[in-house]
Swiss-Prot record:
Plays a role in the reduction of telomerase activity during differentiation of embryonic stem cells by binding to the core promoter of TERT and controlling its down-regulation. Keywords: Isopeptide bond, Methylation, Nucleus, Repressor, Transcription, Transcription regulation, Ubl conjugation. Residues 31-50, 59-80, 762-779 have a biased composition (Low complexity). It is found in: Nucleus; Nucleus speckle. This is YLP motif-containing protein 1. There is a cross-link at residues 894, 951 (Glycyl lysine isopeptide (Lys-Gly) (interchain with G-Cter in SUMO2)).
Amino acid sequence: MYPNWGRYGGSSHYPPPPVPPPPPPVALPEASPGPGYSSSTAPAAPSSSGFMSFREQHLAQLQQLQQMHQKQMQCVLQPHHLPPPPLPPPPVMPGGGYGDWQPPPPPMPPPPGPALSYQKQQQYKHQMIHHQRDGPPGLVPMELESPPESPPVPPGSYMPPSQSYMPPPQPPPSYYPPSSAQPYLPPAQPGPSKPQLPPPPSIPSGNKTAIQQEPLESGAKNKTAEQKQAAPEPDPSTMTPQEQQQYWYRQHLLSLQQRTKVHLPGHKKGLVTAKDVPEPIKEEAPGPAASQVAEPLAAEKPPLPPPNEEAPPPLSPEEPQSEDSEDSEDSEEDARFKQLKAIAAHWQAAAAHWQQQQQQRVGFQYQGIMQRHTQLQQILQQYQQVIQHSPHIQTMSLDVQLRHYEMQQQQFQHLFQDWEREFQLWEEQLHSYPHKDQLQEYEKQWKTWQGHMKATQTYLQEKVNSFQTVKSQYLGNMAMPPPFVPYSQMPPPLPTMPPPVLPPSLPPPVMPPALPTSIPPPGMPPPVMPPSLPTSVPPPGMPPSLSSGPPPVLPPPALSSAGSPPVLPPPALPGGPPILPLPPLSSATPPPGIPPPGAPQGMPPQLTAPLPPASGSQNSQIPEKPRQALLPTPVSFGSTPPSPYHPPPQSEQVNSKPLNKVFSSEQGLGESSALSQSIIAAKDTPVKSGGLLADPPKGSFLEGPRGPREQKEQLQKLKDFGSEPQMADHLPPPDSRLQNPSRPGMYPPPGSYRPPPPMGKPPGSIVRPSAPPARSSIPMTRPPVPIPPPPPPPPPPPPPPPVIKSKTSSVKQERWDEDSFFGLWDTNDDQGLNSEFKRDTATIPSAPVLPPPPVHSSIPPPGPMPMGMPPMSKPPPVQHTVDYGHGRDMPTNKVEQIPYGERITLRPDPLPERSTFDADHAGQRDRYDRDRDREPYFDRPSNITDHRDFKRDRETHRDRDRDRVLDYERDRFDRERRPRDDRNQSYRDKKDHSSSRRGGFDRPSYDRKSDRPPYEGPPMFGGERRTYPEERMPLPAPALGHQPPPVPRVEKKPESKNVDDILKPPGRESRPERIVVIMRGLPGSGKTHVAKLIRDKEVEFGGPAPRVLSLDDYFIAEVEKEEKDPDSGKKVKKKVMEYEYEADMEETYRTSMFKTFKKTLDDGFFPFIILDAINDRVRHFDQFWSAAKTKGFEVYLAEMSADNQTCGKRNIHGRKLKEINKMAEHWEVAPRHMMRLDIRSLLQDAAIEEVEMEDFDANIEDQKEEKKDAEEEESELGYIPKSKWEMDTSEAKLDKLDGLRTGTKRKRDWEAIASRMEDYLQLPDDYETRASEPGKKRVRWADLEEKKDADRKRAIGFVVGQTDWEKITDESGHLAERALNRTKYI
């Protein structure tokens, strides 16, 4: 984290040396881009260069800022008036409003500021604050007084250069009255004083703004702090993170004090300068002025740990702010100061907590980063396999080559999506890693690869597009022929981009081509250009990689940074006004690519500016990009439209400077919301989409494709659900916010409504339609406040942004959300920005367009966001407003307790605002505005990145719970406010995990658009949030719901099953296939009886007899007993099986039974097993339960209950009552998780049967008595030995009983023989009909049997197998008689 700050030069300039007077901007090279840029540049330069001393950096920055502000005051004062009345006509205004600055009323111009980009506004505020703090009172006043210059800056070119300062000036031009500070407050104070007044609903929004700004300030401070830390002196770098934090905090306090002193003099010195700003702010919203002061201070203050620093910084900012307020004027200032103090205290507490949580996170972060390294390497290995060309591919036919490249592109798209997703996750993790400076080599390596991957994507897209174009030209009837249309409709075609793509290795080249493409259409071409850009930027729905080459191309542009984006801005410039701003830009800072203001009215500047960023950004941004992406993403949301313009210049500056510079500038932007946001928007978008390419696309990409992007967004919107997921994984996170707007079906695709703005409709109205929906999720809560401020804007939902940019803010935010989201998500930041820019251009007349994005931008429409979110692997880096709680890593409970605002521990202002939000709709709205402001802050400051990272870490652990709780709260508020939130929530969840991530917040966003917008603002977090929100979304209710259940569970009775449901139909049809019933009960309670009943019932209904394992069987022994033989009357010893209980053997037997039980389970022969044992102790049957469960059996516990006395009488094993009582006293209750079997119905059935049996008992007894009598009579006749042949009454037995056969063997005389023969030959009367019975022997006569057989066969008429006709036809019986002579051998 600290390295990150260092990287962001911006933070370094913020540190201790804030006192330096405001000499002309000289020191920083980056100052050249423009005053605004100088401020941003100053930070960047220090960080980028050999870390100038903070004091030197401050001095240089202050000088530059002063110069810039002076120019701005001159220009803004005049243009300011112009802009409000004539939106497009006043060039200055246009410049300032860039299409949004000029919005209808002065408020509109302010909205332009916001429209410019909430980030820019914030940046502007930061600049103002910095100047004020640093002693550039003039600077602030300048911003306020000289919006004209600001307008020039807004042209998109200048602003970006000023990164943060210029953007603020921009807003001033349009809404100078509000105050330069107000620009920072984009949402609350987008418009001039008038707008500010509209924001008054926002002014609470104003207060909120102040508060929000404070968070923003803290964010800026964090960034500043980060810059200070990273860029600062070697000492901090050598310190441990905690030491650094303490060191930076001390430095911050020191610098804040110095700045306060300087500030006061500055205000006194230049009432026009510093004081001017405060006054306007105070007039419109004293809060803003204070906010401004606090913001810069805050930006400065949070040097080290975003959370910690943030907490302390707010206090310092508050002090300066209060001083400023007092100097400026207003008791309101004092009130705000107190508020800020409270917030600062809260932040300090949060910071302390954050510090504690920080180190634990670092270990996990490092592991996560290493895992990402491994996954990225695996993807690269796959990439090596995919990107292989046949050496003779050039010689092959057009069709073959086209198919080859299409197939390769298709394969690469999936790979690229995986890469983007993993890279963004890696980037997020890296940026959240406090010691990322130790991983710079890794970062360079992966960013180089990121550029290479994007270049490949662009290259393949270009190849496919070129072949398709050629083929379509030949075929003439190809749908592809119109590249623009295809581009807008299909991400694959990116003819425009091809040039950039052509240098696959060089993403920047790709970017520049995009620029030219964009450049061609200054105002008209924009639509075409956007298509090409969109081509590079696949529709949100389509993953960048999916969208053929273009998306990839866009990513490279992202690397190139502003290369492509600038192009897009030109489209936005369609209105002349944007161009006007350009001149100021060039005057302020004729950045590398930005032509003089005279250039194509903003188009050249944009193009130029973007182009340099493209190349520079590409290189420097790749390493840094991740970080930027994290921070910028929110910013870009906040100020996508403006950001696109400024980002390019900023990118240029960044490009000119090393990545560090870019980051530093970005941080500068972070400090000055506007610029940071723009950079973030530009960079972040790429990062999100491309991971490394965030910076370049930032402005240009988002802007470039605006026109086509609108179309594309529509197409992508359609595709979003299908293809976006892939892309969502990589790009969506950053772009998700931009994309989400278009993504959600809820709002027309950004392109959908956007195209009209380019046509000339005010983007506000056109964009707004979509924006309001998207925003509605966010602003809904806040709409009241914002809505009043922006009467002009038809879409009041965005009003929260309107705080500063009333309608414009709304529109712009919406559009910005869409664009930023879209662009970010798309990886073609151009597209998002471009469409936004287009809208801005179209909206130039209506400032509203620009304003919407600034604050709310950071919170893109929740709906769209989801789509973008998935791509955002970095989502976590993005510090989503939703993550307010995440930052502090508070326990879930704590999170629940903490209101939305409080949740955002890391952000100074958020807590109070959030609380307000919780408090009521209006409050929520205000909070929403603040959040928006804050969001941009978070977006812009690198610190925010840290916050996001830390938050992400926390999110990973605590965030889930907290998110659930918070989300639940949000959902609850949303539901109360408007049911729509839930739908949004689910919509986002369904739509995108990323959005879902943000989902928790996003859902609320829908409801409380104002609240959530900030959250959406940071896409990175959104991405991460996406993940959590999903959890959150589902969990929110559960979080509350689940907690109670645990208690009830404990009280809840064990689950029970009725035995009839298992044994009787229809229950037995659906019962488990394998069942084990464990009987337990006292001896004599009827266990064995019930086991038999169960067995019998199972058999009764057709089941196999269950296996009954009874412990009693083990106690049955063979015993010899003397019994009296009934026959002989003698005493005979017989072996009998009897039950003999041996307590010593019980355990042994139980073990043996367990083995048998396991064997039975393993055999699987018995699907129904019954265990019959006392089982008075749980340990006796627990192992049986576990073993059965392991084998997939459903185990039921059948507990017998009976009175001890009854058991003593009934038990057949002779157990004494004393034993039974003792057993009952020590009876153990079965575990609750074991299913009980209710056997009462079985016993009832048995009882009924017994009753029936009793009815028949009388008869049965009578029958028994009769039998006994018969037996007695029989025995009286004499003893008759029984044989097995005499089992029942048979003739033989009767003959014997009759004495006919008694002495057969003794009579050997012939008479006896003869008599016997006669008797023997005498046929029984029933011989013919007698049937043989099994087990019984009877006499048969062969001839008679033969005759019977013949008769039977004759009746049948044939014999199966072989028919013996002789036998059948023999009626005389001669054949049968022969049978008597047959000899049968046995």
